[in-house]
Curated annotation (Swiss-Prot):
Its EC number is 3.5.4.16. This is GTP cyclohydrolase FolE2. Belongs to the GTP cyclohydrolase IV family. It holds the Pfam family GCHY-1. Converts GTP to 7,8-dihydroneopterin triphosphate. Keywords: Hydrolase.
């Protein structure tokens, strides 16, 4: 019997929208199709992971972690390319020895759509079907770039933000969440009040994790946070801009407590958002430790 290569198997997995090209195979029939092809392989090659396990312990999540992969993003401001780190896992029943590790990468190798929440839903559903599981989770972490305009000179430059999109499916029910880390400037109100000359200020990382009933854009979360900071950050500033941001921060001092409360107030006002966590870490310029605050809602 002629052996089938893995690429021969994958070439038949033409799922509309995920595996484009050729004849589409309905997702509901995918696992039966995979089983037929795998039986041909197993006639010659032992398939240890498909054997039974006798320890009677299911595994909540098993799969691959930190797969680096190029992706394109569909956002409110257009399409951009970036490099993502993916963690892809599925539920493994007690009687099954192992999952099909190669299928996670095979799925991504065939994926070519611009990623948004709708595509993440489809990708998660296809993974669960491909791995013949009842539950699965995909987390996609990546640097997100936004073009910013300096406040005085008008010069433009890019600023990066850390983003993680997560899709999770269990027994047919799907949910997604988003996490965004926004770097900003904070200036200490106490230092301003007691000092004759200036006040200590520093970079802060504000992290927002949220779930929503309707899609909330990455850019919207960034805007919520930057509006509450002592001042925004910019990739490139000229001297007039530097003067502006220094004075802007001085006129808008914020404790770490102020930061999380003000951001939380903005998020609560957005009725699309069901739940969130806001964290702020201020890298104190006068200490060798950070100031930190955390709010969870509801």
């Amino acid at each position: 019997m002629q052996l089938l290569k893995a690429s021969d198997i994958i070439s038949h997995l033409q799922i509309d929208g995920i595996f484009p090209g050729g004849n589409a195979i309905p997702c509901t029939h995918l696992n039966n199709y995979m089983n037929i092809k795998e039986k041909q392989l197993m006639n010659t090659i032992a398939d240890v992971q498909s054997s039974r396990d006798l320890r009677n312990l299911p595994i909540n999540q098993v799969g691959i972690k930190d797969l680096r992969f190029p992706i394109t993003l569909q956002t409110a401001e257009g399409i951009q390319s970036t490099i993502a780190r993916l963690t892809m896992t599925v539920y493994l029943p007690a009687e099954q020895k192992g999952t099909h590790m190669s299928r996670f990468v095979a799925l991504m190798e065939q994926y070519s759509e611009a990623l948004d929440f709708a595509q993440l839903h489809r990708l998660t559903a296809e993974m669960v079907a491909l791995l013949d599981s009842r539950a699965g989770k995909i987390s996609v972490s990546f640097p997100f770039f936004r073009k910013k305009t300096a406040p005085v000179s008008g010069i433009q430059s890019l600023l990066d933000y850390d983003v993680c999109l997560t899709g999770e499916m269990k027994d047919g029910a799907y949910g997604h969440s988003m996490k965004v880390m926004i770097p900003v400037t904070s200036l200490c109100p106490c230092s301003k009040e007691i000092s004759q000359y200036g006040a200590h200020n520093q970079r802060s990382h504000v992290t927002v994790s949220l779930t929503a009933d309707a899609e909330v854009g990455i850019e919207e979360v960034i805007d919520y946070v930057e509006a509450q900071a002592s001042c925004q950050l910019y990739g490139l500033l000229k001297r007039p801009d530097e003067k502006y941001v220094t004075e802007k921060a001085y006129e808008n001092p914020k404790f770490v407590e102020d930061m999380v409360r003000d951001v939380a107030t903005s998020l609560i006002a957005d009725k699309r958002i069901k739940s969130f966590v806001v964290e702020s870490e201020n890298f104190e310029s006068i200490h060798n430790h950070s100031a930190y605050a955390y709010i969870a809602y509801p």
